[in-house]
UniProtKB/Swiss-Prot annotation:
Protein name: Uncharacterized protein YIR016W
Residue segments, region Disordered: 21-53, 78-133
Binding positions (ATP): 137-144
Low complexity compositional bias, start-end: 114-123
GO molecular function: ATP binding
Keyword field contains Nucleotide-binding: yes
Taxonomic source organism: Saccharomyces cerevisiae (strain ATCC 204508 / S288c)
Biased composition (Acidic residues): 90-101
Keyword terms, alphabetized: ATP-binding, Nucleotide-binding
Amino acid sequence: MSGTRCLLGVGLPVDVTATETLTHDEQGPGVEPGPCSRGSSIDGLLPSLLGPHDDVDDDSAAFHKYMTLSRDGAGAIHAPSLVEDASRNDDDDDDEDDDDSSMSRDLSKALDMSSSSSSSPRVQSRRHRSSVSAISAILHQGKSGREDITGSLSVPAEQEKLSFLAKASSIFFRRNSMPRDKHTHSVCPASRPDSERFIVTSAAAQSLRRQQQLEDAQYARVITNFRTIGWCSPSEIESVEYKRSLINAEWDEKISLLSHAQCYK
């Protein structure tokens, strides 16, 4: 049997038109096929609405399974109970709401991750500069602490200046005391030990001191002879004594320069 069914609403009448082709075994003699009436023929069509062998999809099968049909005397079809199907639909709606909320949370997390990963190079460089500045501040603090320790152990600046002036003065005296008529050159103090340098310096100073004593003795004899014989006036004797003092001052200056000078080879 083939037919067309139309359900207009719950509690509304259903118009059913069907064209039946029955075999002679199913239909009595003398009965010809034709359109079905609304009264008694609807009872024969109701089982076909709930028939288990109809070719229907899952949704329509579920609808037929959970729907209870009843017919009143006027031929109207009622569907009084859709409780189980409606409760299942409510559960499905709740599940869909939960799925939507979880999907929205996942989507927000994905957007945050994508925004953080796809940030502009300017923002990334700013973050890099901030991290570098933080690291440099930490390193600067450690370096300042080390500088405080080393500064407490180092020589003050005034002592460094004095040592620099002493070195400069020694170089100046060495250049001025070098003899220009001889091809001599100074030897680095570090190339000779301190004892050898002291011996050489003391020997040169002793030779200069001996020459000074010899010359001073000559002037002393001349002054004594002048006073004994009386050939010279007191003013002339005073001039000779003044010259003697000048010569002694020159010898003292030479010896002092030698003490400041370096060794000679």
